[in-house]
Amino acid sequence: MNITTIGRGVIGGGLARRWERAGHKVTLLGRDGGDASDADVVLVAVPSGSISVALDKVTGLEGKIAVDATNAYAGRDEQYESLAHEVKAHTRGPVAKAFNANAGVLYDRIGDQRVAPGCLYAADDEAQVVTRKLIRDAGYEPENVGGLESARALEDFVPGVFSKLTLAPAFYRFAAPGQL
């Protein structure tokens, strides 16, 4: 799969390395933007206050599947239901909210775990299959919390829960008894 990441930092760069190891072709774009025409899917991994600015500098986004990994730490544009909906307004394609509840500083330690850690995600129907594949190819187990209408709850969950954890950054996994 051809993946373009918009953002080359801890999240964008870290996921790019994991996906390249899984056999994907990854193009990393930074602040200057670029072209995503060849991408099958686009990862948005920029500060939340920079989503529109970053996406305005990228051509070839129209109709692409986009995975939004942003969190609202840098604020949000309240004209959108969620940050994922802000991404959707720019790409006009299927969108998933994923990887925003996973600590990028731990990407290199995923393989050391006894079981695959979880990755919460919310996605449009048309983005479900690709999103689950990218989550698994990054080393996580997908944990679906619903359609894109659930993206705001997932965005609000992260600062509300993870900022309170004394063990953060941490892996997590939701499983029924006996599954771990």
Show which residues each predicted segment covers.
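Hydrophobic Val/Ile/Leu positions in short beta-strands of Rossmann-like dinucleotide-binding domains
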Residues: 3-5, 44, 121
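Rossmann-like NAD(P)-binding element
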Residues: 33-65, 69-74
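Rossmann-fold NAD(P)-binding glycine/threonine-rich loop
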Residues: 70-113
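Active-site-lining helix/loop region of Rossmann-like oxidoreductase modules
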Residues: 117-180
